């Protein structure tokens, strides 16, 4: 097995395969033990690799992760960006090659400054802290791409009960720590004092997760609300066609009116009204006149234009409330290339993918109030926003109910929409709140405070999902403290590992010289 730890392509290929295993641990495959195996193989491959070899090994892991887990990017570029097959393939490959470097630098840092092969327990703790820091960096750098976090694999796994304590971050930390400890067990067997501590650290997260899986951190704040979530299933290539506008507006109106039984909340998906709000005022006023006497609130996605202090127009991806409710929400976390184009002065006009409809949105302000419907506070997330754990927690902590609307037609029949759904489920579990998820073509679903889907519609079907959700009160530990305790722990562990490694390098002796 020395070929795994030595520099060279055999170990790099194994790292590539290890990265490819991580998406298989998540939706729609949900083979959660593969997440543990993936991280164990990565740690084993980095345990003795010199810095340069570790850098390439980390890059191979990242490429395997994204090549399998984000293959749906090709569909967005080819099918809806009007790029030719070779160009779409080239752009997708280039993006994956670039994203893989997220893992290259941490692997180099690990080998160069943090690793201590003579202290397997401390080494495992430092590896878990570095993994946590890496996931945080991936969700922040250049607005972030917080996809495929290891912790999502545990939504149906034994560690799920930890999510209300520390969010998906705590699950990822526990997985990385467990993987490293399992790899180091043979070495720990020769160190009885360290072995005892390692066994406690190995078993405690899994036992705690199982024990807390059904614990209710929040409580109902009122009676259940009847919900109608409308899935219009409008084809993406027709959505922004002006000739299809009237048909789409009639479609959502008719789907809403088709059932005589009263409901409390009606939710339409992202940009269900595919024209600027100012041009849809009469239509929205008609919805308001219908909903208000029936004590119904209707929430829909719609593009919104506002002017800044200089009088310049700014366009936003928004949600408005009609009927018995109030509020307007402007999306804050924008999708690169889908809602704004980085370096647009250079990229605009090169290919159709850089000129998609509604790809010039502005970012909404950070201090927006929540939406209000039937007297309840609703935390809104438009599409991509629900994948940001800290951002979502900030809104959820002020809310009684969670709402996410999306248009996942960009991803076709790939695994992307199912990954997106899984992340929404994790947000509900972290917050201990019900979530309404309404999409254009699926998956439209109702999610309970334990992250379980109670009702759902099939993808690519025009239908209305009827069900009930309950407003909740109280804060989970994660909503109260967010990721700050874990971030502090990671800083302490990484600082300790760095200081120990520097002291080790500074100390004279043949063992130190050999490690150099």
Curated annotation (Swiss-Prot):
Keyword hit for Acyltransferase: yes
Gene Ontology cellular component annotations, sorted alphabetically: plasma membrane
Catalytic-site annotation from UniProt: 270 (proton acceptor), 331, 383 (nucleophile)
CDD domains tied to this protein: ALP_N-acyl_transferase
Chain ranges of the CN hydrolase domain: 230-471
A GO molecular-function descriptor: N-acyltransferase activity
Cystine bridges: none
Compartments reported by the entry: Cell inner membrane
Signal peptide: none
Keyword match Protein biosynthesis: no
Purpose of the protein: Catalyzes the phospholipid dependent N-acylation of the N-terminal cysteine of apolipoprotein, the last step in lipoprotein maturation.
Protein name, as recorded: Apolipoprotein N-acyltransferase
Source organism of the structure: Azotobacter vinelandii (strain DJ / ATCC BAA-1303)
Taxonomy of the source species: Bacteria, Pseudomonadati, Pseudomonadota, Gammaproteobacteria, Pseudomonadales
């Amino acid at each position: 097995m020395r070929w795994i730890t030595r520099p060279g392509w055999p170990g790099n290929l194994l790292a590539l395969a290890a990265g490819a295993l991580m998406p298989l641990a998540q939706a729609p495959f949900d083979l959660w033990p593969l997440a543990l195996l993936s991280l164990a193989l990565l740690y084993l491959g980095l345990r003795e690799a010199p810095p340069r070899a570790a850098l390439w090994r980390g890059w191979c892991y990242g490429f395997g992760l994204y090549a399998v887990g984000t293959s749906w990017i090709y569909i967005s570029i080819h099918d809806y960006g009007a790029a030719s097959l070779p160009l779409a393939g080239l752009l997708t490959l280039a993006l994956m090659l670039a994203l893989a470097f997220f893992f290259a630098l941490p692997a180099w840092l690990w080998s160069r400054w943090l690793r201590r092969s003579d202290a397997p327990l401390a080494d495992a703790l430092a590896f878990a802290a570095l993994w946590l820091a890496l996931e945080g960096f991936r969700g922040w750098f250049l607005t972030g791409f917080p996809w495929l976090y290891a912790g999502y694999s545990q939504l149906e796994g034994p560690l799920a009960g930890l999510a209300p304590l520390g969010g998906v971050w705590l699950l990822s930390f526990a997985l990385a720590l467990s993987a490293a400890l399992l790899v180091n067990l043979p070495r720990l067997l020769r160190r009885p004092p360290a072995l005892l501590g390692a066994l406690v650290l190995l078993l405690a997260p899994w036992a705690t997760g199982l024990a807390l899986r059904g614990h209710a951190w929040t409580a109902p704040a009122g009676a259940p609300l009847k919900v109608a979530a409308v899935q219009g299933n409008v084809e993406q290539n027709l959505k922004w066609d002006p000739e299809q506008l009237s048909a789409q507006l009639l479609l959502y109106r008719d789907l809403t009116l088709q059932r005589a039984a009263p409901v409390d909340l009606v939710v339409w998906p992202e940009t269900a009204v595919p024209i600027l709000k100012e041009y849809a005022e009469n239509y929205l006023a008609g919805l308001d006149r219908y909903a208000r006497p029936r004590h119904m609130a209707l929430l829909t996605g719609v593009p919104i234009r506002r002017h800044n202090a200089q009088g310049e127009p700014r366009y936003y991806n928004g949600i408005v409330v009609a009927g018995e409710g109030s509020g307007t929400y402007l999306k804050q976390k924008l999708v690169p290339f889908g809602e704004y184009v980085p370096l647009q002065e250079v990229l605009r006009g090169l290919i159709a993918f850089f000129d998609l409809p509604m790809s010039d949105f502005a970012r909404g302000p950070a201090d927006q109030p929540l939406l209000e419907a039937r007297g309840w506070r609703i935390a809104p997330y438009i599409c991509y926003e629900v994948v940001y754990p800290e951002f979502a927690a900030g809104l959820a902590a002020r809310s009684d109910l969670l709402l996410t609307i999306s248009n996942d037609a960009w991803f076709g029949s790939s695994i992307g929409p199912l990954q997106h759904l899984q992340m929404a489920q994790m947000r509900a579990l972290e917050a201990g709140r019900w979530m309404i998820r309404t999409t254009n073509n699926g998956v439209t679903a109702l999610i309970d405070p334990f992250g379980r889907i109670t009702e759902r519609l099939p993808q690519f079907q025009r239908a209305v999902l009827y069900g009930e959700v309950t407003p909740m009160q109280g804060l989970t530990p994660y909503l109260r403290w967010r990721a700050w305790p874990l971030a502090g722990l990671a800083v302490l562990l990484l600082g300790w590992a760095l200081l120990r490694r520097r002291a080790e390098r500074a100390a004279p002796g043949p063992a130190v010289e050999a490690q150099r």
